[in-house]
Amino acid sequence: MPKRLIVTADDFGLAVPVNEAVELGHLNGILTSASLMVTAPAAADAIERARRLPRLGVGLHMVLVDGQPALPPEQIPDLVAADGRFSRDPFRLGARIFLSSRAQSQAEAEIRAQLTAFRRTRLRLDHVDGHHHFHLHPTVQAILIRLAPEFGIAAIRVPDEPAAVRQHAGASQRMRDWLAAFPLRDRAPAMKRRLARADIRFNDTILGLADSGHIDSARMRALLAALPDGVTELYVHPATRRWGEIDALPDAYRPEAELAALVDPSVRAAVEASGATLTTFQELANPPAVASAESALEESGLSGARS
């Protein structure tokens, strides 16, 4: 089975340093896609940059935890805290959505609003994933599958990082222990079955789960050396510099190092040595020749698909 690699930057739109890193990582490195937070502070800047990058696969980074909703807080009271933002506790919110039909209706309304906001950008929807992987929640999965025909959701990320890959790449024991205790860790196989039945594409494997936020060049090369067959998504959180919100995170969170890894020639060489083809979710449906032709048309201004 051939190896295909999607390299995605999450949190596109969160801040200008993130958006700058997405553009640099795509133009000068191995980054092939980005996941857009449509309600984030720098979303407008991210959208403008994405319009200049026709080969960048842009998906929706659906936010139901730790972020700003698309709907007014009074329309989704079961999902937000007193400040009008989503809760930072995914486990409590997940239980509420699972047990409450009212919360489920509110979650569907909010997801619909975010998909509608993405549609208004006129960017092609490459994929959908979830902030803090909250789309692993079975109710949220069901909502996304139900909305897929209406919004053209053709691919959804499955956060499935095999333990053998983590161990081979040298993930820390602390992170392996944390992932072993992750409440939704066993949802990935069921998620794949549900997506396959709905004819929605997904990655076979994900890389970066155990190393989220601190994948430097050495770690990225180690992950690429362990690249399995099939479709793998490597996700990262790059930025050109730290900013106010991120300063509150531990020093181990190193977005600048992740950008440096994306543009490191030794990392590109590791991709080539792995035998993998860099791609996007969209290209899994469109043959490369077709995708290249479409990109050429967009860059020449002859395609109506470009915003």
Model-derived features with residue positions:
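Terminal accessory/targeting
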Residues: 1-6, 16-127, 138-307
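Active-site histidine-anchored catalytic micro-motif
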Residues: 130-132
